[in-house]
């Protein structure tokens, strides 16, 4: 089994709310919303199969900061207060390489649940 390497570069773009990951096999930009709704935390994934919690209303979430967790993961601190997920190098690599598939599956789950990405937000003006 081949070991998934850490990204060669990690860049946080606060204005565009994206995390740029550079690997030997490509460069990827993951939105804060995508990362937030796919957090590996128990708060999102639950403690077992069927206990996942669908994340709604995260369209405008941003990333406040990043912290290395040893040599194996990245802790992402979101501006909605969520900071309990450790994104391991293999998990980030998987998210980057399968972003389109995972995003569509998330949108399908939202639709099936009658929920939305911007739930509870009030449009002004």
Where do the language-model regions lie?
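Motif-centric detector for short Cys/His coordination patterns
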Residues: 1-125
